[in-house]
Structures are given as structure tokens and as C-alpha cells.
Design a protein with these regions (language model features):
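Amphipathic alpha-helical segments used for helix-helix packing
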Residues: 91-114
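N-terminal intrinsically disordered/low-complexity leader segments
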Residues: 1-7
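Helix-turn-helix
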Residues: 11, 15, 19-53, 57
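Amphipathic alpha-helical packing segments from all-alpha helical-bundle domains
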Residues: 109-133
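Alpha-helical structural segments
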Residues: 11-18, 22, 53-79, 83-90, ...
Length: 133
């Protein structure tokens, strides 16, 4: 019977998110992430195989976190537009490193991300419905 994993993928991704928000993506390496968690580099390599695997999973994790910062709104078009803009502004002002990583530095990944498309589609569909009334 194998040992139970103590450093989970969730712990690694959450720690990396906090490092990103605090220090920016450039501060995140396998070694610095392991040091922040207080473990060897082995759990990170085991979960993600390499930095490319980590980056892909981390990008999706950051998108999910960014999405959680948007208010779900079912009111008027004006209110929906306001709340959507407020979500972007809140992230840009309060978590500029996260905003830069998700929406600026990774434009190509952002365009190809199903999660980002869903984030944009959720509000876009509501906006289109309200415009058609």
C-alpha cells in the first residue's frame, strides 16, 4: 500500500496563486513554490511532470479564481454591464499580478481557454438577450 499524498495538487495551485497575487508570475519556479509550501520539489514534479504541465493547470486555476470575483447578475443591461466591468476593475486594481497573468500576458492561452470562453459567454449571452428586448 502506497503512502498517502500529503501535498495535493490543490495545495500547490493555491500556494502558487497566492505567490502570483503577491509577487507576480516571474517569482514562481518549482524551487520557490516548493520552498513556499515547505516541501521538496518532488510533489510538484509528480503532479505536473514539468513546468509546462504546471503552467497549463495553473492558468486554468487562475481563470476559475478570476471567475469567482465576478458577480452573477440577472438584472438590467446597465447593471449587468456595470457588474461585468466592476469584476475586471476589481481584479485589475486589487490583484494586478493576477490580472496581468490572465488577461494580458497570456492572450493566446486566454483565447483558447474553455474556462475564459465560458466566463465571457455567461455575461455576453445575458447582454445579448437584454439588447434584443
Amino acid at each position: 500500500m502506497g503512502r498517502k499524498t500529503q501535498i495535493t495538487k490543490e495545495i500547490i495551485l493555491e500556494t502558487a496563486l497566492q505567490m502570483l497575487i503577491r509577487d507576480g508570475y516571474g517569482a514562481i519556479t518549482v524551487k520557490t513554490l516548493a520552498a513556499e509550501i515547505g516541501c521538496s520539489t518532488q510533489p510538484i514534479v509528480w503532479h505536473f511532470e514539468n513546468m509546462n504541465g504546471f503552467r497549463k493547470a495553473f492558468f486554468e486555476y487562475c481563470i476559475d479564481y478570476a471567475k469567482s470575483q465576478f458577480t452573477v447578475w440577472n438584472g438590467s443591461l446597465d447593471d449587468l454591464l456595470t457588474e461585468t466591468a466592476r469584476g475586471y476593475i476589481t481584479i485589475a486594481c486589487n490583484m494586478p499580478n493576477l490580472f496581468r497573468f490572465v488577461f494580458v500576458d497570456n492572450k493566446d492561452e486566454c483565447k483558447n481557454s474553455d474556462v475564459v470562453q465560458k466566463l465571457q459567454l455567461d455575461n455576453t449571452k445575458k447582454i445579448i438577450r437584454l439588447l434584443c428586448k
